[in-house]
Amino acid sequence: MSGVAIARGSAADVDAVMRIMDAAFDPAFGEAWNRAQVLGILALGDVWLDLATPAGAESPEGFALARRTLDEAELLLLAVRPEARRQGIGEALVEAVAAEAGVRGGLRLLLEMRDGNPALSLYARTGFGQIGRRRDYYRGRDRSLHDALTLARPLARDPIDT
C-alpha cells in the first residue's frame, strides 16, 4: 500500500472517474455507472470520492465512491485500471474508505457485488465477510443472471452483533 497517494475527489474529477471506470469494468456485466449517475450521487450529502494515484503516476489509477447513511457506510464503487492492478491500489482505497466511514460515524462498511467478480479476494483480504445473497439480482448484457453478494466489514463495535 505504500506509494499510493489517496486524495479526496469531487465532481470536478468526473473525467478521471469515467476514464478509470471505462477501463476497469467489463461491459458484459453492465456494472459501470454513467457520468450522470456519478455526478448525481456526488451531489448528495454524506457521499465521498477517493482517488488513488500510485507513486510515479501522473493521474489517478483508481477510485472509490462511498456514502454514509445513519450508522452504516456503503462502498458504492471501487475501480482500478487493469494495468495498475496488483499494486496495492485497491487495498489502499478500501482502507481509506473504511477510515473515512469511521470518522463519519459508520459502525460497519457494506458493499454489494456480483458473484464471480474477481474483486472478492480483495474484499476478503481487507476484512469483509459475506452476510447475504440475492439470487439472480444482476442481468448481464447477454441476459444471463448473476447473484449479488452482500459483504460487510466492521468498523467499530457494532451493537447489532453484541
Residues of each region from the PLM?
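Acetyl-CoA-dependent GNAT
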Residues: 8-85, 91-96, 100, 104, ...
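Conserved GNAT acetyl-CoA-binding A-motif
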Residues: 101-114, 122
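Conserved catalytic-core motifs of GNAT/GCN5-like acyltransferases
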Residues: 110-112, 129-150
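Short glycine-rich hinge loops at helix-strand junctions in the catalytic core
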Residues: 88, 127
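Terminal substrate-recognition subdomain of acyl/acetyltransferases
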Residues: 2, 143-162
